[in-house]
Amino acid sequence: MAQKIIKVRDIEIANDKPFVLFGGINVLESRDLAMQACEEYVRVTEKLGIPYVFKASFDKANRSSITSFRGPGLEEGMKIFEEVKKTFGVPVITDVHEPHQAAAVAEVCDIIQLPAFLSRQTDLVVAMAKTGAVINIKKAQFLAPQEMKHILTKCEEAGNDQLILCERGSSFGYNNLVVDMLGFGIMKQFEYPVFFDVTHALQMPGGRADSAGGRRAQVTDLAKAGMSQGLAGLFLEAHPDPENAKCDGPCALRLNKLEPFLSQLKQLDDLVKSFPPIETA
């Protein structure tokens, strides 16, 4: 099965190529934190030879509580992203929540992300697609893998085939998510690159009453399980002080564990992609 290659600058993203990291922090808590985190990601990924894209949100529009921290907003967020790009020379990905934001975000960011909760919102999907930017489509927690085909079609009909799919877990009762490993293979049949958002798959939505809980201790186990499926990339959030992170701290990898964590995943990805395919249909 031929796999589509999506290009972001000089990075080639495909299910049969070495994995790409979309990594960063959950939300732009501050300019200084963004710079600190990106510097460490760049150091580690350059050392390990992993293609890298910095990620963060300028607005967390779907927080549990009205009092939850949301971020600096569109204008200030784009300024921070521009500084990150200029300082470190890396591409940037961020999420778009409303149709009117799409064009402005696409002017600055190399990849724009369709949030899982909003992935069926046709007006948003079409507005993002019409920018012509590469789009990372998060699979909603309530959608089956095969239903992602409809979202791909919406983008294609709007004239955009620069698309990436991203698994982030499925609802499993209340306050819990699970990852169906068979879903990766189903989505790979669409031939677009497939990523695994291990950070948000560790969430326990609403698990702390007014915010999400998480299972950071299991990040390595879940990441290895997902990346053993031969994927285009990994989506990861890390933080220097997860206990005091302003969003999703319980799911975030400790930033000082980034190098050993990614080193093991790089070795696993290289091994899995060295195997010849076996036809079992």
Curated annotation (Swiss-Prot):
It is found in: Cytoplasm. Its EC number is 2.5.1.55. Its main location: cytoplasm. It comes from the Bacteria. Pathway: Carbohydrate biosynthesis; 3-deoxy-D-manno-octulosonate biosynthesis; 3-deoxy-D-manno-octulosonate from D-ribulose 5-phosphate: step 2/3; Bacterial outer membrane biogenesis; lipopolysaccharide biosynthesis. Keywords: Cytoplasm, Lipopolysaccharide biosynthesis, Transferase. GO terms for biological process: keto-3-deoxy-D-manno-octulosonic acid biosynthetic process. It catalyses: D-arabinose 5-phosphate + phosphoenolpyruvate + H2O = 3-deoxy-alpha-D-manno-2-octulosonate-8-phosphate + phosphate. InterPro entries: Aldolase_TIM, DAHP1/KDSA, KDO8P_synthase. Pfam families: DAHP_synth_1 (PF00793). It is an enzyme of class 2 (transferase). Belongs to the KdsA family. HAMAP family: KDO8P_synth (MF_00056). NCBIfam families: KDO8P_synth, PRK05198.1, PRK12457.1. This is 2-dehydro-3-deoxyphosphooctonate aldolase.
